[in-house]
């Protein structure tokens, strides 16, 4: 995802990968150039053999729509010629905005190699390099992004049991990364893929372009991420930690269960204000059909102080993820069931207003396994006019944006 614009002194800047030395004064031989500065939080070594032969010698690109596109990268489906196996080829420009970004691509490759034994992280097959690009040949996830289910009609969207299973997998993957000092920093529905759509497959975590290595002795501050999912400490330019990912998982869980983006405002400034002031609601209609345990799970993560958030390991032990079935419908759901039974018995129930605005904006599916990607956002639910009744009719408007380089307003940096 596009990094939010960084203050001049913060974060890591792309480093040069080569340089030209100058002869030392009074020395008899050429002077070796100093090593390039290492960006903080980035891995610099990979095990993969970087192939330089033409990519088309080994793979055929599939015709049709791209799997995803961003400012500096594009993902296309391809077929390995000698096996017929499907892969996703991620073409990444090495030079962006006049800067050499090869080091950041190397870091992404290194993180994928570090996580190669984890079933919930996308698998890296091999790497190619040309004069202008690096090409990552990745496992193909045929089910696409979980974002598509998040914005689907509620009848077709995730059920709570689905989210329980997928969230266990997400947390197992994130716990694996955290125990290896990797913080993802861009966890969102567009960066969680499915191995199949029907039947619902398993998850694959993708896009490590913003990820960083965090050692206990180091402190890292950077302004980056997708506006709706960034943690409060990102906005206040406080140190990043593993808890920064856990905030994003809280937002992700909220979105998967309800189809609503909890902090989304009318513009980015309002979104940032909602996050910094913790303006969120658990009273939406969608919560009526969720277990109390699910709501409690979200509450353990959407906590302003990073040190008070549940860790990935603690989340995996939460009752919502350890119980075998959904056993805690809310009081309002119980009331709705009582009304349904009363209706079957011939008793009157409050009339439900069915006048809903069903306009939705359809956009092409974008598989955002990219360093820099188009960010789609989930619009807040807009309720229709309601009378005095137990249930309200809801319509959804999903808002889609193509942000440029994000900049957090100055009043949020303090």
From Swiss-Prot:
Post-translational modification comment from the UniProt entry: Autophosphorylated.
Domain Protein kinase positions: 61-321
Entry GO MF terms: ATP binding; protein serine kinase activity; protein serine/threonine kinase activity
Major localization class: nucleus
Coiled coil: none
Region of interest (Disordered), residue spans: 1-40, 342-363
Tissue expression remark: Highly expressed in placenta. Lower levels in heart, lung, skeletal muscle, kidney and pancreas.
Active site (catalytic residues): 186
Swiss-Prot/TrEMBL keywords: Apoptosis, ATP-binding, Kinase, Nucleotide-binding, Nucleus, Phosphoprotein, Serine/threonine-protein kinase, Transferase
UniProt catalytic activity: L-seryl-[protein] + ATP = O-phospho-L-seryl-[protein] + ADP + H(+); L-threonyl-[protein] + ATP = O-phospho-L-threonyl-[protein] + ADP + H(+)
Protein name: Serine/threonine-protein kinase 17A
Originating organism: Homo sapiens (Human)
